[in-house]
Amino acid sequence: MGSAKSAMLILLVAMVIASCATAIDMSVVSYDDNNRLHSVFDAEASLIFESWMVKHGKVYGSVAEKERRLTIFEDNLRFINNRNAENLSYRLGLTGFADLSLHEYKEVCHGADPRPPRNHVFMTSSDRYKTSADDVLPKSVDWRNEGAVTEVKDQGHCRSCWAFSTVGAVEGLNKIVTGELVTLSEQDLINCNKENNGCGGGKLETAYEFIMKNGGLGTDNDYPYKAVNGVCDGRLKENNKNVMIDGYENLPANDESALMKAVAHQPVTAVIDSSSREFQLYESGVFDGSCGTNLNHGVVVVGYGTENGRDYWLVKNSRGITWGEAGYMKMARNIANPRGLCGIAMRASYPLKNSFSTDKSSIA
């Protein structure tokens, strides 16, 4: 009898482990006929959490902190499964933010200041990409296919999205104009662009102005990313090729057609509202979920297209490759709101570069 009970216990444990193995894709746990989680949820969630910790290199300072994170993780896991059961055009998953509450996620990720700079020294408004009846634009654009997009980067716990979005647009334009894709330095902006606040956040327009006034941007190899505020060291740019721009312009506000035309010509920076739980846990598909227009996060729009009949913007984030579709989001395009989903058409801008140019001077 004892051996039979032991065998039964082993069988039950094996069933739990097997069910967890199918859930290790970090996206879904099975439901019963009433869409209620099975009674094994807690056991599965704990094992999934351990695997998730390994995948994302998570280590907590105490048992109490780990238990607190597990509680948040379980709540996010339930939310993911409930939303994914609704057969949406996108799916949620256990991103690197799955152990954070929504409030904590906002504190970590939002670094774009939507307020206009007090002194637009170089900024000009432009109708360069205003659409007309004669325009014939490609049905889809993906600047990755043209070699104009560097690898997805991760800003870490530094609120430096403003730097990553600016740098991404400059990297793309530099490739288009010069034929050379150069990975540029966000740390250069964080340390040296004193009119912004480094890991405390910043304005994209101010970053463009800094690049113009201070001899361009250094490369990531010369000035690598540290994810913390540092002292500006001009020597890191001395005698090295720095990528320059000639100016920048803002797109007409609340005009997705103008944004589309601009993206057909070059990658474009945009400030969006990324403060929803769905955005925090986005995994794949065309996102048309909950978000407002409280602009707080800088991204790069590197293309557009249509998937399963749904138009989308191809957005490069700076949260590493474990968020979204290997670091990218397909965000619904051509929605009823002229501001665009998450305000993507409200505050878009792009750099200008007329020719190949470098500067070997340092900055103070």
From Swiss-Prot:
It holds the Pfam family Peptidase_C1. Residues 1-23 form the signal peptide. Probable thiol protease. The active site is at C161, H297, N317. The keyword Signal applies. Glycans are attached at N87. Belongs to the peptidase C1 family. Expressed in inflorescences. It comes from the Eukaryota. CDD domains: Peptidase_C1A (cd02248). Gene3D superfamilies: Cysteine proteinases (3.90.70.10). GO terms for biological process: proteolysis. The gene is RDL4. Residues 24-136 form a propeptide. Its EC number is 3.4.22.-. PANTHER family: CYSTEINE PROTEASE FAMILY C1-RELATED. InterPro entries: Papain-like_cys_pep_sf, Pept_his_AS, Peptidase_C1A, Peptidase_C1A_C, Peptidase_C1A_papain-like, Prot_inhib_I29. It comes from Arabidopsis thaliana (Mouse-ear cress). One of its GO terms (molecular function) is cysteine-type peptidase activity. Keywords: Disulfide bond, Glycoprotein, Hydrolase, Protease, Signal, Thiol protease, Zymogen. Disulfide bonds join C158-C199, C192-C232, C291-C342. This is Probable cysteine protease RDL4.
